[in-house]
């Protein structure tokens, strides 16, 4: 079995569902986070985060077979504090990347934080993550800062993070 996108059928909207994540989904989210990020957040950290009244989290699930159960393939977590919000983490597993699922998650999170009264939304993204940068720029995010050496690799390397911001006051 390969992990390329060619191994999977094209994804139609009827096969993708977005669900609001609850604290009870922390184990499931921790497994996804471990596939996507190093270091990964554990279930306890995610459970605590999901219990925060200012947090919003979405899980993307895909139905791979007409009658099969949906499989979690991505998630997004954000948090609102006063009139600002931040995307804490967003990711889609490799076989399902570049298929519109990240955009669905980002748009869902955008709507959630915008309706909560946040005026600006911020996030950090690795400077070299072209796919994520393309997504965020398409949504209107602009670079507002840079954090040198923010991301640490398992081999001791580091990568700069770009801080991106989005004005939510002009969003419908």
Predicted regions and their residues:
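Acetyl-CoA-dependent GNAT
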Residues: 3, 11-99, 103-112, 116, ...
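Conserved catalytic-core motifs of GNAT/GCN5-like acyltransferases
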Residues: 44, 122-124, 137, 142-159
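Conserved beta-strand edge residues that scaffold enzyme active sites
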Residues: 47, 64, 127-128, 150-151
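Short amphipathic helical patch at the helix-1/turn junction of helix-turn-helix
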Residues: 92, 126-127
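Short glycine/proline-centered loop/turn elements that form peptide/ligand docking sites
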Residues: 106, 129-132, 149-155
């Amino acid at each position: 079995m390969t992990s390329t996108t060619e191994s999977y059928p094209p994804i139609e909207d009827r096969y993708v569902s977005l669900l609001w994540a609850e604290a009870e989904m922390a184990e499931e989210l921790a497994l996804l986070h471990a596939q996507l990020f190093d270091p990964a957040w554990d279930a306890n950290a995610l459970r605590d985060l999901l219990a925060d009244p200012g947090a919003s989290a979405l899980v993307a699930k895909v139905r791979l077979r007409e009658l099969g159960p949906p499989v979690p393939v991505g998630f997004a977590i954000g948090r609102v504090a006063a009139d600002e919000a931040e995307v804490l983490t967003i990711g889609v597993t490799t076989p399902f990347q570049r298929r519109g699922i990240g955009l669905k998650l980002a748009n869902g999170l955008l709507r959630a934080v915008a309706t909560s009264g946040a005026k600006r939304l911020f996030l950090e993204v690795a400077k070299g993550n072209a796919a994520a940068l393309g997504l965020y720029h398409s949504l209107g995010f602009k670079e507002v800062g840079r954090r040198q050496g923010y991301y640490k690799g398992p081999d001791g390397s580091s990568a700069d993070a770009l801080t991106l911001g989005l004005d939510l006051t002009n969003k419908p």
